[in-house]
Amino acid sequence: MKVSDRRKFEKANFDEFESALNNKNDLVHCPSITLFESIPTEVRSFYEDEKSGLIKVVKFRTGAMDRKRSFEKVVISVMVGKNVKKFLTFVEDEPDFQGGPIPSKYLIPKKINLMVYTLFQVHTLKFNRKDYDTLSLFYLNRGYYNELSFRVLERCHEIASARPNDSSTMRTFTDFVSGAPIVRSLQKSTIRKYGYNLAPYMFLLLHVDELSIFSAYQASLPGEKKVDTERLKRDLCPRKPIEIKYFSQICNDMMNKKDRLGDILHIILRACALNFGAGPRGGAGDEEDRSITNEEPIIPSVDEHGLKVCKLRSPNTPRRLRKTLDAVKALLVSSCACTARDLDIFDDNNGVAMWKWIKILYHEVAQETTLKDSYRITLVPSSDGISLLAFAGPQRNVYVDDTTRRIQLYTDYNKNGSSEPRLKTLDGLTSDYVFYFVTVLRQMQICALGNSYDAFNHDPWMDVVGFEDPNQVTNRDISRIVLYSYMFLNTAKGCLVEYATFRQYMRELPKNAPQKLNFREMRQGLIALGRHCVGSRFETDLYESATSELMANHSVQTGRNIYGVDSFSLTSVSGTTATLLQERASERWIQWLGLESDYHCSFSSTRNAEDVVAGEAASSNHHQKISRVTRKRPREPKSTNDILVAGQKLFGSSFEFRDLHQLRLCYEIYMADTPSVAVQAPPGYGKTELFHLPLIALASKGDVEYVSFLFVPYTVLLANCMIRLGRRGCLNVAPVRNFIEEGYDGVTDLYVGIYDDLASTNFTDRIAAWENIVECTFRTNNVKLGYLIVDEFHNFETEVYRQSQFGGITNLDFDAFEKAIFLSGTAPEAVADAALQRIGLTGLAKKSMDINELKRSEDLSRGLSSYPTRMFNLIKEKSEVPLGHVHKIRKKVESQPEEALKLLLALFESEPESKAIVVASTTNEVEELACSWRKYFRVVWIHGKLGAAEKVSRTKEFVTDGSMQVLIGTKLVTEGIDIKQLMMVIMLDNRLNIIELIQGVGRLRDGGLCYLLSRKNSWAARNRKGELPPIKEGCITEQVREFYGLESKKGKKGQHVGCCGSRTDLSADTVELIERMDRLAEKQATASMSIVALPSSFQESNSSDRYRKYCSSDEDSNTCIHGSANASTNASTNAITTASTNVRTNATTNASTNATTNASTNASTNATTNASTNATTNSSTNATTTASTNVRTSATTTASINVRTSATTTESTNSSTNATTTESTNSSTNATTTESTNSNTSATTTASINVRTSATTTESTNSSTSATTTASINVRTSATTTKSINSSTNATTTESTNSNTNATTTESTNSSTNATTTESTNSSTNATTTESTNSNTSAATTESTNSNTSATTTESTNASAKEDANKDGNAEDNRFHPVTDINKESYKRKGSQMVLLERKKLKAQFPNTSENMNVLQFLGFRSDEIKHLFLYGIDIYFCPEGVFTQYGLCKGCQKMFELCVCWAGQKVSYRRIAWEALAVERMLRNDEEYKEYLEDIEPYHGDPVGYLKYFSVKRREIYSQIQRNYAWYLAITRRRETISVLDSTRGKQGSQVFRMSGRQIKELYFKVWSNLRESKTEVLQYFLNWDEKKCQEEWEAKDDTVVVEALEKGGVFQRLRSMTSAGLQGPQYVKLQFSRHHRQLRSRYELSLGMHLRDQIALGVTPSKVPHWTAFLSMLIGLFYNKTFRQKLEYLLEQISEVWLLPHWLDLANVEVLAADDTRVPLYMLMVAVHKELDSDDVPDGRFDILLCRDSSREVGE
């Protein structure tokens, strides 16, 4: 900067220059206009860094993408350091929420249009140039608005999280499935990300009044920038005036900027008005009022598209408007942060999701204002219910208690919007007044008014009964009903006493009070008195406090979280119990007020005298602190002998404790008064017996019944725990879910559940109400809560990702239990203390306390939760490092799965009856290993994505089924499972921490092997916040000592215990198992030596890939084996025969060829090879191929080669030749082991080995072995394996071959060998025999050797080739040499061999040869049967929610795309077939059975392919059931049988319709439709339940879509699903029946309409108007779901039975039946006649009696 510029800069008085330059952005905002007018400026480009969010200047090295996103600014450059430059840009004073930044003349617009479209996503709106200038402010100040949006969103989230159960919050975002709030706990970084995404839309909301599209609502006064609130007010609520102060000032503190949300909400409301407006109309001064008739364009119809928005209170009063605005505040949080299940908060297609929410929300609000008579759950009842008190009639809520003779009121008003009734008992004086008013004063009032009184009209709130036609009821009738029903009437106006009248009395009375209270303040004051004065006097009376909260119209959550009242719910107890609770609460209140000192409700007689005395003593001193006194119960004495007897019951008469520590702990738990105990013992120590024996001892007590609870961390442990704890019948064990759903059953001693059950609200409520429930249900107080046992409680602290799920445990009343026991094998003091505090307990005791001192301690009186937990650390007491009995090996391998498979194969070869556990790191790896290893073992796999029932079932199967060998799972299988046969644990996880290691190794109770396998060149991933770090390199035992706080022995004697090769502490069985495994490993290493020499191309190309897939079929495995044999064997032969032939040929015949041949060939080839090269051959060959062999061989192959080869061929060749030659040949060959015999024999060996080796590689070995070998072997073997090996071998036994062989073996053995192996190995070898040998050996060559070679080529090679090429393979063959198979297994990243095989199997099972593939074809039905049973309209909407409807997966099979089993060209997906299979199951089940079936197949809800396999197992059974159940249906629909009404005896006796003629039935049918047409009645609703509601759009529409929209608008489909079994299908299934599903029926029906019209005209009568297709379809759908009608029709018409699918019902309805006069009418006409008969008396000859005579086998419907 120049000196002159610096002076000008100083004059600018830029005080904040230093702080501004410290900003990390290259672009710094400067508000000084003087600076920019004084100092020269320049234009530079800037961009926003995506990672840091900072504004950076574009430089030479800036990337292309950043340059593309850059923008230009007018700036002043300032050097702030060495080579550090900042740029100042002009921006006026920092914008606030009201105004925002102001554009300056230094702004250079660039790509503003593109910016608006891409950034704001409001391309559907039109902007002018001024709007673009306004919108560009955000681009210039994006960082500011990002931070602004983040602060607002953070504030919203804090409010919603602090008050998740507030009424406004609950209404706006609530999980509509579970009813619980779904405000999620978000990290600050997540909220910041959401805030940045929300920033553009926050900017729009703040500046929406500055845009041209908002000009319609600008104020008319000059200079006024605010909104015309009066006009906006009228647009929002055109019928009800509201006070403007509540509109503009939501809360005073908000508008005073104490809470800036007020400004945001104000703008949101303006945006809502903008959305509903019809556009700019007449400029800013247009004051035209909108009438009621013009409301449709103001509030357009909104299609929710699946968005669930709870209806709000109508904002027609200031208070309700404020509530509505509070809901909008919650809506802002809901739409922007809390309900954002995915990262995509905004909808790219339809703009901002928040705008849609607001639009739908205010549409509901405005619609409620217009239609105030419509039923709204949030508005019923709208007052405290005092106006609607009735002493008679259907709405009666005033009763008299039989015992106390007191008036009781059942009111259903509740603040949280529910209609659950509340029982309130009045005192005696008030009851007398009410009784006198009803019995005396009301009768006098009726007499005074007289019989002509008719002031009351029929209002919707009245439930008029006793009249056949409610529309014909007169006002006199209504008035008489009201006088004899309701208490508070305004007879002058003809209405109930308004709520305002009662409120007015509250303002006037009591007259002597200086300050009056309204109803709300009175109610709050009463409940405050109830909390602080009418307090609980007993420990067991805490539920009464909760009952008082409920009776005061507070939710349970409000009472617990805000007022500190215990959790409770009246819905968790029976109806009688709820009544007694509320009676007792009223009694306590009346007694405290002194209204009746001697009043006792009927329940109080069950109290004990001791309780009354204690209560009187407590009530005498209200001002003192109320201490909790434990109610006395019978208690039997305990002794140490109880534990011994329990042990003998469980383990037999020879029972003994493991050690004194176990004995002492059992006595401590059973005998001591310590309320809370924590135990840390090593895995496998027997922690279960520490509480199992005391539980058995408690169960043996006769007078007192103890009910205890055990909780484990994972579902997979439930089955194992229930089996162990329920053995020998010592305890009655049941799941906790039974207790939560049904309560205590009276027989269970121990309930077992998981942590989620412990944290559930229902369990907390059950425990809180335990005392009262037991006393009310069993009429005794001798049932007591025993032990609360939590196993592996360290998970409360270490399971970081589950800690949010444990929050509900803090609400549990621990004091209700006699003792709490916490067990773990990996919970040192620090972990245990933190885990206990996390669930609401005090933590561990800091120092030991004597039991006598404990009894005197004041803490004991406060209960278990306030007393510290005593810790028993058996690991420190014994000073022994755990898990020393297990041999722990840590290995780094290339492939973890392959190494694990080797270990498992070796284990089961050594110990066939053993079991093993494999712990994988991911769920995908679990499934892949299970699929890959199924051909080797009986596998069970488990991971967290399975359902709870499936986890329990699989765990139980592995524990109980001895044939199951391997359990594969994630780390959830490492805790708590006890399996005696377990001998090996393998962990495949690079992120294994010390706790997971100890828990996994601890599964080996009696010793065994534990392998920790990790990949080479791998690194451990960074652990998440709060998680334990992974285990380190080095000694495992030392890390275990460090974790438990034991003394380190690093570098000392005894450091290694069961690790690092130490075996001193292992059992003899474990050592023996290790030795056997080592021997097997040596054999495998010897057999796999040739694999080391494999080219790198045949090794795994990418061993560091995280996800691997393995071959799972014999076909794929054989392919890999054969390919490896081709490549590796031939390559090894080439390598063997190039460098040093003699040594390598013999050595390879011994070590390489034999081993390779043995390893790579199957049984038949091995047999051939073994026949030719015995074990002695190898030894003899090895003996002869010493170090001097090379010298010998390189020199010449005359004497030494002969000797060496003779040694090789005396056993090998003779054995191989002996297999095919005679005795003379053997003797001659043995005798002729001279210079030439050996070469001959070695050549024979070479030829035969080549033939054998090549013959065992492929299928076409016989004809041409060279075709299957590699290049080098093809060259040398092709000469000997042409058309006839015999001829080539005979042809090569000439004299010239000897010289050739001698020539090739003199100069260079290597070249000679290469020459002999390329041109004529067999010929040169066979020709090397001498004259005498030739005569003998050539004969042997022609007769025996040829036959040997031929036999090997034809028989043995064929057999081996056939066996090897067999696709199915042989399990024993494959497992004969498993090591080589594993090492040669191919690997593919996508489309693994397992997937390919699975795809092939499914394709064969479901060929899908045509587009009309149907599951009925799969079941075996014929085409004519399928025609009538065809499943029309079965698609995704038929399935219930969550069944085969997962997103983000393959649409055809619902699997991950890497595991997709769909095949190219597939016309019908597996998911489609699964839908139809589900429909077939629906055909065979009624509503209840089908509902149970859906629950049974819950594990398959996300796996249609697995469901098809499950379905195909029952294929024949299902086919038989359909044939049996639908035989009548096929006979009728195929016109083989005709229905005649006269054949139905019950129909003729019980219905007039069955005695009508066909003409009468048709006339009745047309009359019904004529009445429906005239009244414009909803057809579907009428035939569903005879409800005559009007729907004019349905009759005027000619399009199916319009009809569906009309029915949907009226809520018909919603009522249909809630009232009938339609809810068992998808929510859109019934709606889609109006589409093209039934086009064949539609064409048939429309054809019948034409024929009907033609017949009517031909007869000369006026044609009757018949319904069009849509109305006709609505009729049949309504009849199908009308349960009463269906039962009635099936009872009367004996020829038909039940059908459960709508298409079958439609097809059945169109068959013709014979009426009483033998004329044919469609069955649907008969249906309509029966339907009409059930509802009216328009049937000829009068109305029939519905209560017909009942058949013994079938009952009439209700």
From Swiss-Prot:
Region spans: Disordered: 1142-1384
Extract one GO cellular component term from the record.
cytoplasm
Which CDD domains did the record assign? SF2_C
Superkingdom field: Eukaryota
Keyword Transcription part of the UniProt annotation: no
Q: Which Gene3D superfamilies match?
A: P-loop containing nucleotide triphosphate hydrolases
Residue ranges with Low complexity bias = 1142-1360
* One Pfam assignment: Sir1
EC no.? 5.6.2.-
One MF term in the entry's GO annotations: nucleic acid binding
Q: Which segments show compositional bias classed as Basic and acidic residues?
A: 1361-1384
The biological processes this protein is annotated with in GO are: telomere maintenance via recombination
Q: What class of enzyme is it?
A: isomerase
Q: What induces it?
A: Induced in absence of telomerase TLC1.
- Domain Helicase ATP-binding stretches: 668-845
Which residues are ATP-binding? Answer: 681-688
Function comment: Catalyzes DNA unwinding and is involved in telomerase-independent telomere maintenance.
Q: What is the protein name for this chain? A: Y' element ATP-dependent helicase YJL225C
What species is given as this protein's source? Saccharomyces cerevisiae (strain ATCC 204508 / S288c) (Baker's yeast)
